[in-house]
């Protein structure tokens, strides 16, 4: 009597519920299943694991700067998130994270998807030591030019931090 195979949707649910440490065992368990859907599922999760590994490596490289300056005090990251009079105002954010923060995918906001920006917003607002937002209107951009308006928005964001930064990283 042959054993009935699990449905691909059931296997998909198993993978979705698995922790990162459980995935290698699942790959082994299902590697002999020749169905294309199962093999595609394994490949999908392996690609996600590889992407996560690369992101952790990228984040560790970024921490080189943090460790280089950590003895100086609070380190603040600054990012301009909106640009140009045609597209609206210039908005800048300034964030001080706890030392050795483990937040992944921190990057130039324009390189992130809208979904990832929303996810990171929640994490940053929950974990940050301090957050400041600065703004320059399209009229202000026309008045002083885009570059100066960007600097002005960044200065405003820094001034709104509840903790004074000692080092600024742009």
Model-identified regions with their sequence ranges:
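Acidic (Asp/Glu) carboxylate-rich active-site/surface patches
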Residues: 1-76, 80, 86-170
């Amino acid at each position: 009597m042959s054993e009935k195979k699990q449905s691909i949707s059931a296997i998909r649910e198993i993978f979705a519920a698995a922790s990162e440490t459980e995935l290698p065992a699942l790959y082994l368990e299902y590697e002999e299943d020749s169905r294309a859907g199962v093999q595609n599922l394994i490949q999908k999760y392996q690609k996600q694991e590889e992407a996560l590994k690369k992101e952790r490596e990228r984040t560790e490289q970024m921490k080189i700067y943090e460790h280089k300056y950590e003895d100086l005090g609070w380190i603040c990251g600054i990012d301009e998130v909106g640009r140009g009079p045609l597209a609206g105002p210039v908005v800048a954010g300034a964030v001080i994270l706890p030392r050795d923060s483990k937040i992944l995918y921190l990057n130039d906001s324009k390189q992130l998807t809208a979904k990832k920006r929303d996810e990171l917003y929640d994490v940053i607002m929950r974990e940050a030591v301090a957050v400041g937002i600065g703004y320059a209107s399209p009229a202000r951009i026309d008045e002083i030019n885009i570059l100066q308006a960007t600097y002005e928005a960044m200065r405003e964001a820094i001034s709104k931090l509840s903790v004074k930064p000692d080092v600024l990283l742009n």
